Protein backbone atom coordinates (compact mmCIF):
# COMPACT_ATOMS: atom_id res chain seq x y z
CA UNK A 1 0.00 0.00 0.00
CA UNK A 2 2.85 2.40 0.81
CA UNK A 3 4.14 2.14 -2.75
CA UNK A 4 0.79 3.23 -4.18
CA UNK A 5 0.37 6.05 -1.67
CA UNK A 6 3.90 7.30 -2.27
CA UNK A 7 2.95 8.15 -5.85
CA UNK A 8 0.28 10.53 -4.55
CA UNK A 9 1.97 12.02 -1.47
CA UNK A 10 4.66 14.64 -0.99
CA UNK A 11 6.01 12.90 2.12
CA UNK A 12 5.24 10.22 4.70
CA UNK A 13 5.00 10.93 8.40
CA UNK A 14 4.82 7.61 10.22
CA UNK A 15 2.72 7.78 13.39
CA UNK A 16 4.41 5.09 15.42
CA UNK A 17 1.84 4.93 18.22
CA UNK A 18 -0.99 4.09 15.83
CA UNK A 19 1.26 1.91 13.67
CA UNK A 20 2.18 -0.17 16.72
CA UNK A 21 -1.43 -0.43 17.87
CA UNK A 22 -2.73 -1.58 14.50
CA UNK A 23 0.22 -3.79 13.57
CA UNK A 24 0.04 -5.72 16.84
CA UNK A 25 -3.77 -5.50 17.17
CA UNK A 26 -3.41 -4.12 20.70
CA UNK A 27 -5.69 -1.44 22.13
CA UNK A 28 -3.30 0.96 23.84
CA UNK A 29 -6.19 2.39 25.87
CA UNK A 30 -6.71 -0.97 27.59
CA UNK A 31 -4.33 -1.29 30.57
CA UNK A 32 -4.78 -5.08 30.56
CA UNK A 33 -2.97 -5.19 27.22
CA UNK A 34 -0.04 -2.92 28.15
CA UNK A 35 2.40 -5.82 28.16
CA UNK A 36 1.56 -6.58 24.53
CA UNK A 37 2.08 -3.02 23.26
CA UNK A 38 5.69 -3.22 22.12
CA UNK A 39 6.83 -0.50 19.75
CA UNK A 40 10.18 -2.30 19.41
CA UNK A 41 8.47 -5.41 18.04
CA UNK A 42 10.18 -6.64 14.85
CA UNK A 43 6.90 -6.37 12.92
CA UNK A 44 6.61 -2.67 13.75
CA UNK A 45 10.22 -1.95 12.79
CA UNK A 46 9.81 -3.91 9.56
CA UNK A 47 6.72 -1.87 8.68
CA UNK A 48 8.66 1.36 9.27
CA UNK A 49 11.50 0.16 7.02
CA UNK A 50 9.03 -0.85 4.31
CA UNK A 51 7.39 2.59 4.36
CA UNK A 52 10.76 4.38 4.26
CA UNK A 53 11.96 2.25 1.34
CA UNK A 54 8.76 2.89 -0.63
CA UNK A 55 8.96 6.61 0.07
CA UNK A 56 12.54 6.82 -1.16
CA UNK A 57 11.77 4.80 -4.29
CA UNK A 58 9.10 7.40 -5.07
CA UNK A 59 11.48 10.28 -4.35
CA UNK A 60 9.78 11.53 -1.19
CA UNK A 61 10.98 11.71 2.41
CA UNK A 62 9.74 9.70 5.36
CA UNK A 63 9.73 10.89 8.94
CA UNK A 64 8.88 9.41 12.31
CA UNK A 65 6.44 10.98 14.73
CA UNK A 66 5.10 9.55 17.94
CA UNK A 67 6.94 8.20 20.95
CA UNK A 68 9.45 6.17 18.96
CA UNK A 69 10.95 9.26 17.37
CA UNK A 70 12.33 10.27 20.77
CA UNK A 71 13.47 6.78 21.74
CA UNK A 72 17.26 7.05 21.86
CA UNK A 73 17.63 3.27 21.76
CA UNK A 74 16.28 3.37 18.19
CA UNK A 75 17.91 6.52 16.82
CA UNK A 76 20.77 4.67 15.11
CA UNK A 77 18.35 2.05 13.80
CA UNK A 78 16.25 4.80 12.22
CA UNK A 79 19.37 6.29 10.62
CA UNK A 80 20.24 2.84 9.29
CA UNK A 81 16.71 2.52 7.87
CA UNK A 82 17.11 5.84 6.08
CA UNK A 83 14.50 7.77 8.06
CA UNK A 84 14.78 11.40 6.96
CA UNK A 85 13.28 13.18 9.96
CA UNK A 86 12.48 12.52 13.61
CA UNK A 87 9.75 14.55 15.25
CA UNK A 88 10.55 14.87 18.96
CA UNK A 89 9.52 17.03 21.89
CA UNK A 90 11.89 19.90 22.76
CA UNK A 91 13.27 18.08 25.80
CA UNK A 92 14.49 15.19 23.64
CA UNK A 93 16.23 17.21 20.92
CA UNK A 94 19.69 17.37 22.52
CA UNK A 95 20.04 13.64 23.31
CA UNK A 96 18.81 12.70 19.82
CA UNK A 97 21.06 15.30 18.18
CA UNK A 98 24.10 13.95 20.06
CA UNK A 99 23.45 10.41 18.85
CA UNK A 100 23.03 11.62 15.28
CA UNK A 101 26.23 13.69 15.42
CA UNK A 102 28.20 10.81 16.93
CA UNK A 103 27.00 8.33 14.30
CA UNK A 104 28.98 7.70 11.15
CA UNK A 105 26.15 6.89 8.76
CA UNK A 106 28.59 5.38 6.26
CA UNK A 107 29.31 2.62 8.79
CA UNK A 108 25.66 1.62 9.21
What are these regions, as identified by a protein language model?
Residues 1-108:
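Conserved alpha/beta-domain cores
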Amino acid sequence: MADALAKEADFFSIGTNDLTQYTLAVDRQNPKLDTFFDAHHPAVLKMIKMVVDNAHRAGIWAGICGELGADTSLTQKFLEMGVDELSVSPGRILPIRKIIRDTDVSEL
